[in-house]
Amino acid sequence: MLGNYSSATEFFLLGFPGSQEVCRILFATFFLLYAVTVMGNVVIIITVCVDKCLQSPIYFFLGHLCVLEILITSTAVPFMLWGLLLPSTQIMSLTACAAQLYLYLSLGTLELALMGVMAVDRYVAVCNPLRYNIIMNSSTFIWVIIVSWVLGFLSEIWPVYATFQLTFCKSSVLDHFYCDRGQLLKVSCEDTLFREFILFLMAVFIIIGSLIPTIVSYTYIISTNLKIPSASGWRKSFSTCASHFTYVVIGYGSCLFLYVKPKQTQAAEYNRVVSLLVLVVTPFLNPFIFTLRNDKFIQAFGDGMKHCYKLLKN
């Protein structure tokens, strides 16, 4: 029966509704956020790589997290900006749409895994400080990163393949600023109920699976902190986890709102807002969350700026 339908070979993305003036304001806002996101995360990556004081597992993981933030936001934001500037050009081929969705989901899965790894790292640092260098040695965290990258990209092969095995004949218009899976399911002329349920279960498995080590780690961290008699000691212990905990709340919260829902094809406005939180706001906040209250990083960054100034002066 599906043979009578012709599937779309390209999609037109509606992006953001509104007048040309509104689009220009959105373009200026998102371009500024994107530029600050890239520059801020690049600064962290360079500082972590060149400063010997930051050669520890947590900063190694932070550097990888910054790389991921740049890659994740770059999967959709440049195309979104182009669409705001020239709305009539928001056309994407089926192959490009599949590639964008695959990269976005794979990098997102990898980011969740990395957040879980960083939580375990904080657990070891707080609860087993004397064994930290033994447990989190160089070979351990390098293998953890390799496994995370491999699993991140392998885990999303079937979900994306299953999505693009559908026939998209209801419409070639996606009411979003990137190739959102919910919108793709919405324009399919096939019954997607079972497929949506399987995708929902996989999203639950990935998100909750990476959330478990985070919850367990912070349970032990809080338990250990409560045993510290002095308030200053408690604050010092928790300060090592505060930035990561803040990032976890924002990251997992937005992912749960966006993906862990039985019905993937819910309101486009809702998906657009939460997608902006994942693709624009969180990557933008990342450099500030991890560095503003980190005295060690601020010192390293200051030393680096002084060194650059001396080189330029000479």
Curated annotation (Swiss-Prot):
SS bonds (residue pairs): 97-179
PANTHER family tied to this protein: OLFACTORY RECEPTOR, OLFACTORY RECEPTOR 6V1
InterPro entries named among the record's database cross-references: GPCR_Rhodpsn, GPCR_Rhodpsn_7TM, Olfact_rcpt, Olfact_rcpt_6C-like
SUPFAM superfamilies in the record: Family A G protein-coupled receptor-like (SSF81321)
Protein's name according to its UniProt entry: Olfactory receptor 9A1
Sugar attachment sites: 4
Localization annotation: Cell membrane
Cytoplasmic side: 46-64, 121-140, 218-239, 293-314
Function: Odorant receptor.
Transmembrane segments: 25-45, 65-85, 100-120, 141-161, 197-217, 240-260, 272-292
Organism: Homo sapiens (Human)
Stretches assigned to the Extracellular side: 1-24, 86-99, 162-196, 261-271
UniProt entry keywords in alphabetical sequence: Cell membrane, Disulfide bond, G-protein coupled receptor, Glycoprotein, Membrane, Olfaction, Receptor, Sensory transduction, Transducer, Transmembrane, Transmembrane helix
GO MF annotations, alphabetized: G protein-coupled receptor activity; olfactory receptor activity
Membrane-protein topology: Multi-pass membrane protein
GO cellular component: plasma membrane
Pfam families: 7tm_4
Main location: membrane
UniProt similarity note: Belongs to the G-protein coupled receptor 1 family.
